[in-house]
Amino acid sequence: MLIVVSPAKTLDYESPLATDLSTQPDFIADSEELIHVCRKLTPLDISSLMKVSDKIASLNAIRFEEWSPIFTSDNSRQALFAFKGDVYTGLDAASFSDDDFDYAQRHLRMLSGLYGLLKPLDLMQPYRLEMGTKLANDRGANLYQFWGNKITEKLNAAIEEQGDKTLINLASNEYFKAVKPALLNADVITPIFKDCKNGQYKIISFYAKKARGLMARFIIENRIATIEELKRFAVDGYYFVSAESSEKELMFKREEQFK
C-alpha cells in the first residue's frame, strides 16, 4: 500500500540526521517555476497571501530568494527530517532502521505546495507555501491548478512500483484536494481518528495529526500489506470501530486523555 501525508509548517534543519542517504525531488523544474512567482512577492504580499506574521513573511522572502535548483547537503535535508509537525512527531523517523527507510522510500509520499510530491529521502530546501495558498501563476489561479494532474500521475507511478492498488490517505483535506481520486489507479482508504472529549467523540486536530503519523509508522514498521492488518492498529490507545467504518473510511477512536 502507498501512504500519503501532509507536510508541516514547522521545519527542522538542526537535529542530527538518522541517515545520510538522500534522493532528488521529482518536480524541481516545477518548483523553480513557483519560486520565480514567489520572488516577485514583497514581505507584505507574503504576509497578506499566507496570513502570517511580518517576521515569518520576511523569513520566507529570504528563503525564496536563496532557493537554488541545485539541491545539496549544504542547502537541503531529507524531507522526512525537515518537516517537524504533529504528523512527524507520530512518525518519529529518527528511530527508523535502514530497512524502515528503504520501505518508507517505496511506500510513503508527502504532498507539498512547492515540491508537489516528495519521497521521504528527497532533499528539500526550507520553504513555506501551503497547498491552499491562492498564488496566481501561469497555469491558473492557485496551486491546485498549477499542479493539475502531475501529482496524481506521479502517485500512479509509485502505486505501480510498490505492487498493489491501495492508497492510504493520511493527509489533510487541504492537501488531498491536490490528488484526483478518479484518475488514481488505486482504492483510496481514509482513516479517521476521533478522541473522546467531555463524553463526545470528535476529531481533535492535534491528536488526529499525531495519529496519522503513528499509523504511517505502524504501516512502515510492520510492513502492513492489507486493510485487515491495518484495522489492527492499536497504538496510543486507539482502536478500530467496525460499526462506524465503511469500504472507504476506517474509524478509530480513543478514550479521553487526561494529562
Swiss-Prot record:
Signal sequence interval, chain numbering: none
Pfam families in the record: H2O2_YaaD
UniProt GO BP: response to hydroperoxide
Highest taxon above the source species: Bacteria
InterPro entries attached to this UniProt entry: YaaA
GO CC annotation terms, alphabetical: cytosol
Protein family per UniProt: Belongs to the UPF0246 family.
PANTHER family: PEROXIDE STRESS RESISTANCE PROTEIN YAAA, PEROXIDE STRESS RESPONSE PROTEIN YAAA
UniProt-listed HAMAP family: UPF0246 (MF_00652)
Protein name per its UniProtKB record: UPF0246 protein VSAL_I2547
